[in-house]
């Protein structure tokens, strides 16, 4: 197993890089891929840049160049669930795109043309490992598993936040 860990911004991956035993660095598409070990686990950590296109390109490079078996996206996110506080941890059970809408082509909001799914399910074993690990290292925080909504915009209005949630 080799895990690719993506963060959009440098502060989201800096601590991971500091904790790694680095074997090599590699640059492609203006991204620096840092390969090595985190504990005893082979990982590749990378700052992708903000946005779903950057994350998708980064993921493909991780698969093609580094043969990662799993991809984890880590970082800061907006807060829509009123039961959560800043700093709480959400492990995704599935992912939806809140800004994908091709309704005029007879697709449901969030559905990508050509795909039969509305949401992308996370790996059950990774969810369980992440929940256990997060609760061990941050017992003072609320740790939950739930749906994550992604979009290429900052949600700054309560109306949009309510619509997404």
Where on the chain are the PLM-derived regions?
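Short glycine-aromatic motifs
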Residues: 19-27
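Short, conserved "active-site rim" segments that organize catalytic pockets and cofactor/ligand binding
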Residues: 1-20
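Glycine-rich phosphate- or other oxyanion-binding loops that anchor nucleotides, phosphorylated ligands
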Residues: 2, 26-165
């Amino acid at each position: 197993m080799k895990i690719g860990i993506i963060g959009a911004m440098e502060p989201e991956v800096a601590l991971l890089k500091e904790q790694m035993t680095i074997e090599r660095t590699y640059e492609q598409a203006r991204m620096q891929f840092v390969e090595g070990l985190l504990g005893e686990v082979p990982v590749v950590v990378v700052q992708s840049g903000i946005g779903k296109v950057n994350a998708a390109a980064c993921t493909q490079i991780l698969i093609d160049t580094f043969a990662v078996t799993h991809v984890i996206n880590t970082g800061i996110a907006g807060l829509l669930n009123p039961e959560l506080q800043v700093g709480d941890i959400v492990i995704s059970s599935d992912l939806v795109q809140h800004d994908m809408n091709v309704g005029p082509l007879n697709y449901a909001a969030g559905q990508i043309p050509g795909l039969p799914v509305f949401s992308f399910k996370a790996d059950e074993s990774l969810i369980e490992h992440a929940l256990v690990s997060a609760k061990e290292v941050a017992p003072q925080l609320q740790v939950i598993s739930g749906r994550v909504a992604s979009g290429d915009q900052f949600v700054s209005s309560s109306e949009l936040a309510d619509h997404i949630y």
